[in-house]
């Protein structure tokens, strides 16, 4: 890492700039233009333009990377990530309610329905089933609407509640039809029947359908590119907004000098953001070189990165949050390349995922392993402590169905 350290800006300048412009470093690439404009609102010298290119492959001379780069431009934000961001006060005000909510998320199937046994899940968490169910009902306030329901009827009821209809009679008619979906034609002569039916047809079925059908575009900050003589890091500079100065419009004055300094500080902050992200890419390439060649991730902690930049782990964590890296293996959140801190263990999350895959591959097809059992086996093998929702998250990232879903699939194949 000596080369990386030698290229870092002087510590004092780095600290001063980051303290003043930390939001620029932490912002997502998609939001960077707006963040810069907010900083430049009162400065007539600054002009900000977005030069984002439409085709990422235009920037690469390496033929191999150009062929695949189109596939790097988008990545899917999972249902898990979308819901996890909503598990906050005031809807989930306590640690217990948040713990239950995360457990519920981990028990959702790909369509967004909760099919797990509430009594069993509550027992594992050490809470009353009534408390667990109360938290689950709060999912009616989350997006996507209908998520966390047990079945279609309850999902429709959740979505109905989220509509907040002013017409109470229309609400009651719609609710009645939902509760009697199998025989809704019996109400066809009701005054509000057609209006209620129109509302029902607008509901999402299944509730997570948007996550099954489409991907949300993300713009990678970094590209790890294979070239003839090795692998290199390239910053996605073409997606950055540009800052230009229009100082010729004003005569020399104290006001101009002050605004000119502010403008140059903003440019320095943007350049520092680029340099910081690029150096993160250099470090990842150095530490995770084997991964980019098709092998497994090495254990790497955020603390290692924080030490390189002389900043706290929390600052670095915020700096890489919601930022992506594209390589031949796909598009990944930058945080993907760091091990999860597990009681100071050096065990990489990639190693745990591999073992999880092995367990699923060799499980009893009649009695598939629950996440709780997988947790028990992993803790025993690696001599560490984890929480079950971490296992569930790993399973979902690996596109492995829940134990109940796997059991149904095994029966279908038998």
UniProtKB/Swiss-Prot annotation:
Residues 301-320 bind DNA. GO terms for molecular function: DNA-binding transcription activator activity; nucleotidyltransferase activity; sigma factor activity; transcription cis-regulatory region binding. Pfam families: Sigma54_AID (PF00309), Sigma54_CBD (PF04963), Sigma54_DBD (PF04552). The keyword Cytoplasm does not apply. Keywords: DNA-binding, DNA-directed RNA polymerase, Nucleotidyltransferase, Sigma factor, Transcription, Transcription regulation, Transferase. The keyword Hydrolase does not apply. One of its GO terms (biological process) is DNA-templated transcription initiation. A motif (RPON box) lies at residues 387-395. GO terms for cellular component: DNA-directed RNA polymerase complex; protein-DNA complex. It comes from the Bacteria. Belongs to the sigma-54 factor family. PANTHER family: RNA POLYMERASE SIGMA-54 FACTOR. Sigma factors are initiation factors that promote the attachment of RNA polymerase to specific initiation sites and are then released. NCBIfam families: PRK05932.2-4, rpoN_sigma. This is RNA polymerase sigma-54 factor.
